[in-house]
Amino acid sequence: GSICLEPKVVGPCKARIRRFYFDSETGKCTPFIYGGCGGNGNNFETLHACRAICRA
């Protein structure tokens, strides 16, 4: 899906939430720390969800 091509966005908030995003350069789902608000669709709660949607 096109959300998998969106850039990683931490967002403006200061929470430290472990999420996963699809890295289009490596073709892999990669963990990152999400701020808790803002962001975009390339933000998954689990590695499994990221892989399922982005076919990684």
UniProtKB/Swiss-Prot annotation:
InterPro entries: Kunitz_BPTI, Kunitz_BPTI_sf, Prtase_inh_Kunz-CS, TFPI/VKTCI-like. Its main location: secreted. Pfam families: Kunitz_BPTI (PF00014). Coiled coil: none annotated. It is found in: Secreted; Nematocyst. Keywords: Disulfide bond, Ion channel impairing toxin, Nematocyst, Protease inhibitor, Secreted, Serine protease inhibitor, Toxin. Residues 4-54 form the BPTI/Kunitz inhibitor domain. One of its GO terms (cellular component) is nematocyst. One of its GO terms (molecular function) is ion channel regulator activity. Negative results: has no activity on Kv1.1/KCNA1, Kv1.2/KCNA2, Kv1.3/KCNA3, Kv1.4/KCNA4, Kv1.5/KCNA5, Kv1.6/KCNA6, Shaker, Kv11.1/KCNH2/ERG1 potassium channels and on TRPV1, the capsaicin receptors. A synonymy between H.magnifica and R.crispa is controversial. Belongs to the venom Kunitz-type family. Sea anemone type 2 potassium channel toxin subfamily. This is PI-stichotoxin-Hcr2o. It comes from Radianthus crispa. The lineage of its organism: Eukaryota, Metazoa, Cnidaria, Anthozoa, Hexacorallia.
